[in-house]
Amino acid sequence: MQTLQTTSLRVSENQLFILDQQALPQEKRWLAADNVALLVDHIHALRVRGAPLIGLSASLLLALLAQRGLNRDALQQALETLRAARPTAVNLMNNLDRMKQALAREDYPQALEAEALRLVEEDKQLCDRIAEAGSALVKPGSRLLTHCNTGGLATAGVGTALGVIALAHRQGKVANVWVDETRPLLQGGRLTAWELGELGVPYQLITDSMAASLMAQGQVDAVWVGADRIAANGDVANKIGTYSLAVLAHYHQIPFYVAAPQTTLDRYCPNGAAIPIEQRAAAEVTGVAGSFGAVQWAPMGAAVYNPAFDVTPAGLVSGWVLDSGVVTPAQVAAGAFAPDNG
């Protein structure tokens, strides 16, 4: 396969490497991900994360395995194992559905490579279109609040919600970005803060519980988040804490926008209640660990509830910013995300 490089993925000498997002921002470390078990472990450990990026990494690995001579049955088994690696992120399923079609072809090694590379290029283009559509909604002098990480670290391109913010900044419309630290794994504090710093976008890091106070003071003009899955009725599964922000924004009459590619739509999922929510390890809540070290602050054996995602009802969303353009609440209510409109 040809050499390929994005912010977080690299293909070199027929091997897949991922940027270890658990080591950032203290260390920029690339890790091999050249077999299924290893990539699944990276996904579970969130060394590779972001719904679009997970789907792309799985697709690229399948293509590389085919280049190494794995037969169709072995590749099918690998595909199913990868498919189960992150149940909430529908981009993974959508990408692998396309790879499955390529696997059915007689020339499947070549077809898988072509499809994986096509998915990467499409993701870059989708991100650009999302940024263009979303930046038109950003008013000059805006103070924006964002949650988790939705930039180039999570996609092959400029990102989704963070891509919107970055383009709006280049257009001179962003006064400040409030970055939720995003407990418990601090993707905002570690990753989004790092990306915004690299892009030269002015930001201030806050704890998740500070958002309400800022909104009450009139310090937030809009909230921008990404999505891991969008149901047919417009409900949005995203990083835990997103629902809280949506409720706060609604109360304070602040626009709440969801930026995502159409590959994040699950038109056959009727509503948020049907979206599987991944439950994660207690250790993520009882302490913290990373390249900076490890510490535990909760009592040993403390009972923990740790869902990775929550669901924001469609009624709290001001607009869904897709690569096809901005979709309004009225359009969603009229069936814009229904199966027969796909």
Curated annotation (Swiss-Prot):
InterPro entries reported in the protein's UniProt record: IF-2B-related, IF-M1Pi, IF_2B-like_C, Initiation_fac_2B_a/b/d, M1Pi_N, NagB/RpiA_transferase-like
Listed pathway(s): Amino-acid biosynthesis; L-methionine biosynthesis via salvage pathway; L-methionine from S-methyl-5-thio-alpha-D-ribose 1-phosphate: step 1/6
Entry keyword set: Amino-acid biosynthesis, Isomerase, Methionine biosynthesis
Enzyme class (EC, first level): isomerase
Protein residues bound to substrate: 49-51, 86, 187, 238-239
Residues under site feature: Transition state stabilizer: 148
Domain of life: Bacteria
NCBIfam families (UniProt xref): eIF-2B_rel (TIGR00524), PRK05720.1 (NF004326), salvage_mtnA (TIGR00512)
Family: Belongs to the eIF-2B alpha/beta/delta subunits family. MtnA subfamily.
Protein name listed in UniProt: Methylthioribose-1-phosphate isomerase
Organism: Klebsiella pneumoniae (strain 342)
Gene for this chain: mtnA
